[in-house]
């Protein structure tokens, strides 16, 4: 009998949620995703020292202004790590726009253009990149414009149906609904434990997946942020699942019989008129979990971006 991970790959595209090249070699995912927290973690791996040095040298060659050097070094490091990962995966790398731009459409678009340019200079076509943006109204609007330019986007920090619907209506290539962080909120709020079938994160992704398929939206659903393999098994059949190394290892070392739980609708019905900004903000605001977790997610990514910049500042000073 094939292990659980190999069975899962029959129904769902598996993506590695890591910047760790050794983990990617081990589990052979189709794609990989990174975020500011994972880049910070990866930057502390000794094997990546040369990638950091390259980013620092490049940044110094671009400008004499320290703030600009820091911005450039940070972007270049994320791209350098992405380029290394793309040597190992046949599909795409997701690289995230600075979380501090989550409420600035124009600056998010400018940062996306810069990341695409840096990848191009490194010999990587935009067809192998997904630009990650927070699923704020501004992030979704930025994605809408980028998609029209042929720059595919991954809308992340997605916790609510309103966010998912707006992303699909904007023509986003892919969304990353967060499963485990939804579970965290409900466990803390209710004091209850949930089995995988009733896990609020699993229920949320299932609802989004079914809505997309019923209404003929092409936006890819990629479940993210898992707390246990039970959540993953309950989402077998989802378009993609991005999974961290520890859970990939657990799946590879287990032999649980997998059957697809999410199955695409065979017929579609017309979607409703797209949400207006006012409708989106109201619907989103009605979900206290989503409001809390989006704000927290943006803050935490910004904190880790700041930690990375402290490390890079020290290196730029040398």
Curated annotation (Swiss-Prot):
GO terms for molecular function: transaldolase activity. It catalyses: D-sedoheptulose 7-phosphate + D-glyceraldehyde 3-phosphate = D-erythrose 4-phosphate + beta-D-fructose 6-phosphate. Transaldolase is important for the balance of metabolites in the pentose-phosphate pathway. The active site is at residue 132. Belongs to the transaldolase family. Type 1 subfamily. GO terms for biological process: carbohydrate metabolic process; pentose-phosphate shunt. Pathway: Carbohydrate degradation; pentose phosphate pathway; D-glyceraldehyde 3-phosphate and beta-D-fructose 6-phosphate from D-ribose 5-phosphate and D-xylulose 5-phosphate (non-oxidative stage): step 2/3. Its main location: cytoplasm. It comes from Shewanella baltica (strain OS223). InterPro entries: Aldolase_TIM, TAL/FSA, Transaldolase_1, Transaldolase_AS. It is an enzyme of class 2 (transferase). It holds the Pfam family TAL_FSA. One of its GO terms (cellular component) is cytosol. This is Transaldolase. The keyword Cytoplasm applies. Keywords: Cytoplasm, Pentose shunt, Schiff base, Transferase.
């Amino acid at each position: 009998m094939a292990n659980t991970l190999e069975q899962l790959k029959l129904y769902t595209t598996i993506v590695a949620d890591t910047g760790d090249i050794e983990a990617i070699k081990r589990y052979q995912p189709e794609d990989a995703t990174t975020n500011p927290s994972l880049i910070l973690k990866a930057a502390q791996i000794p094997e990546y020292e040369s990638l950091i040095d390259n980013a620092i040298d490049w940044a110094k060659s671009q400008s004499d202004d320290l703030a600009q050097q820091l911005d450039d070094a940070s972007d270049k490091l994320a791209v350098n790590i992405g380029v290394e990962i793309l040597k190992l995966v046949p599909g795409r790398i997701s690289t995230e726009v600075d979380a501090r731009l989550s409420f600035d459409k124009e600056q998010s678009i400018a940062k996306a253009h810069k990341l695409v340019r840096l990848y191009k200079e490194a010999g990587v076509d935009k067809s192998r990149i997904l630009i990650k943006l927070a699923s704020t109204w501004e992030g979704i609007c930025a994605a809408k414009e980028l998609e029209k330019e042929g720059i595919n986007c991954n809308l992340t920090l997605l916790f609510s149906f309103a966010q998912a619907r707006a992303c699909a209506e904007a023509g986003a290539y892919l969304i990353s609904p967060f499963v485990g962080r939804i579970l965290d909120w409900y466990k803390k709020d209710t004091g209850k434990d949930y089995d995988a079938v009733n896990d609020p994160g699993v229920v949320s992704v299932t609802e989004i997946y079914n809505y997309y398929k019923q209404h003929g939206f092409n936006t890819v659903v990629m479940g993210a942020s898992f707390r246990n393999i039970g959540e993953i098994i309950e989402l077998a059949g989802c378009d993609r699942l991005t999974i961290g190394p520890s859970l990939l290892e657990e799946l590879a070392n287990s032999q649980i019989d997998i059957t697809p739980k999410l199955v695409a609708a065979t017929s579609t019905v017309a979607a409703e008129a797209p949400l207006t900004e006012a409708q989106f903000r109201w619907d989103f605001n009605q979900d206290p979990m989503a409001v809390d977790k989006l704000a927290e997610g943006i803050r935490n990514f910004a904190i880790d971006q700041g930690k990375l910049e402290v490390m890079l500042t020290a290196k730029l000073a040398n």
